[in-house]
């Protein structure tokens, strides 16, 4: 297949639309089910590169959950804990025996479930039945992978009455070294972003604390790979091989840090006994529970706890999760890694990151205030690596 006609472009009025190879060669994909759209393919091709890089850097299967050309979550395939199984809504499945790929998607989808609603999924490895069954129960637009087992494909083809988008990509495909895009009729050309994220990139530790565990090195690489395919400006918090907060597309660096930090905080607050024991009605769906939890742990909690409202969601009225209780719980969050796609211009980013348990940071460096940023890291005993490489993505 040399080209594929699409229903429309970014919006329904943008017609005609298609994807094709400029050199006339075959497309590196096959559509096995559904009719993927323009934005679906943007998510699919960006997400595929991300999981391919994660697999190469860590040796583990990887998954990502994309929305609007940025990852809402991404992870490598480490086993789930009982608490994670609960907050990712898979405790009713055989999660203890999930394949590594299924664990990766459970983590990628579970990190920020509000943002992942209606995601496009990318998988580094052949999709197995475990992963397909997990995908089947979520609201999702589609999936791309290098292959599918017969059982997995049968499961996925049942989704959306047979209209779920399933794409197979050639894992051996390598794009040309130069890439092009047009804006306002003008063609832009640049070298493809082929930077390898490896141990050498994070070897320049500029803080007093120079101790990096193997897990910290892994999480630094995971954060930088995620940022490589996230709309800039971007910041990513990572713990145990998975993104727990991605701040994408912000014009201000500190707003990235705050946005991603709040998402990371929400991820950890969802693990608190107060949230785990919320008395949901049995009829409340997973998506409705996600929405209710998001409001409950936020500043507008009375929207879900007010008389006349709580009865719609809970069997009994939950107690308020006070600001003091939340802070006490968040103070237990430790060993978080923070990656940034460009330098921190002010030390306020470090102050905010520390509140979310950040112990390790990877960023390019190069600010006129690098010394202030380093001093603030030293104040909190944070280990920080300067990569010397910016990772903007537009």
Residue ranges and their predicted role:
Residues 119, 123-124, 137-167, 172-174, ...:
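C-terminal binding/interaction regions
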Residues 57-65, 166-169, 232-239, 269-280, ...:
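Flexible, glycine/charged-enriched surface loops at secondary-structure junctions
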Residues 201, 213, 218, 222, ...:
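C-terminal accessory/binding modules appended to enzymatic or scaffolding proteins
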Residues 70, 127, 239-242, 250, ...:
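Active-site-proximal loop/turn and secondary-structure-junction residues that shape catalytic pockets
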Residues 72-113, 244-343:
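Glycine- and Gly-Pro-enriched alpha-helical subdomains that act as flexible
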Residues 177-212, 270-291:
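Substrate-contacting helices/loops that form the catalytic groove of nucleic-acid
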Residues 23-35, 111-117, 193-210, 288-309, ...:
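Gly-rich Lys/Arg/Thr-decorated short loops/hinges at beta-loop-alpha junctions or inter-strand turns
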Residues 1-201, 216-234:
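Active-site loops and adjacent core secondary-structure elements that bind or stabilize anionic groups
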């Amino acid at each position: 297949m040399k080209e594929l006609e699409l229903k429309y472009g970014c919006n329904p009025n943008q017609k005609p639309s298609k994807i094709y190879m400029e050199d006339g060669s075959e497309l590196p994909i096959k559509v096995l089910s559904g009719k993927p759209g323009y934005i679906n393919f943007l998510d699919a091709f960006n997400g595929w590169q991300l999981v391919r890089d994660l697999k190469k850097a860590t040796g583990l299967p990887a998954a990502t959950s994309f929305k609007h050309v940025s990852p809402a979550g991404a992870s490598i395939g480490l086993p789930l804990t009982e608490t994670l199984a609960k907050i990712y809504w898979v405790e009713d499945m055989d999660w203890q025996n999930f394949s590594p790929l299924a664990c990766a998607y459970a983590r990628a989808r579970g990190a920020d479930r509000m943002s992942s609603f209606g995601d496009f999924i990318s998988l580094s490895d052949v999709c197995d039945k475990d992963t397909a069954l997990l995908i089947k129960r979520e609201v999702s637009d589609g999936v791309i992978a290098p292959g599918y087992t017969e059982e997995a494909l049968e499961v996925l083809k049942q989704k959306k009455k047979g209209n779920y988008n399933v794409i197979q990509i050639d894992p051996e495909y390598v794009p040309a070294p130069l890439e092009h895009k047009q804006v306002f009729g003008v063609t832009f050309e640049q070298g493809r972003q082929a930077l390898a994220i490896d141990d050498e990139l994070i070897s320049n530790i500029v803080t007093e604390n120079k101790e990096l565990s193997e897990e910290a090195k892994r999480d630094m690489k995971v954060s930088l790979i995620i940022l490589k395919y996230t709309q800039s400006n971007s910041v990513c918090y990572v713990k145990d091989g998975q993104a727990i907060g991605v701040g994408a597309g912000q014009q201000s660096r500190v707003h990235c840090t705050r946005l991603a930090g709040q998402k990371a905080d929400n991820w950890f607050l969802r693990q608190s006994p107060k949230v785990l024991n919320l008395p949901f009605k049995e009829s409340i769906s997973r998506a409705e529970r996600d929405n209710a939890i998001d409001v409950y742990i936020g500043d507008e909690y009375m929207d879900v706890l007010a008389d006349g409202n709580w009865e719609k969601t809970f069997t009994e009225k939950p107690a308020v999760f006070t600001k003091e209780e939340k802070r006490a719980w968040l103070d237990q969050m430790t060993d978080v890694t923070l990656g940034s796609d460009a330098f921190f211009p002010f030390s306020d980013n470090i102050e905010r990151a520390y509140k979310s348990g950040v112990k390790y940071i990877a960023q390019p460096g190069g600010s006129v205030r690098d010394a202030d940023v380093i001093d603030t890291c030293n104040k909190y005993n944070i280990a920080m690596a300067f990569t010397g490489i910016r990772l903007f993505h537009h």
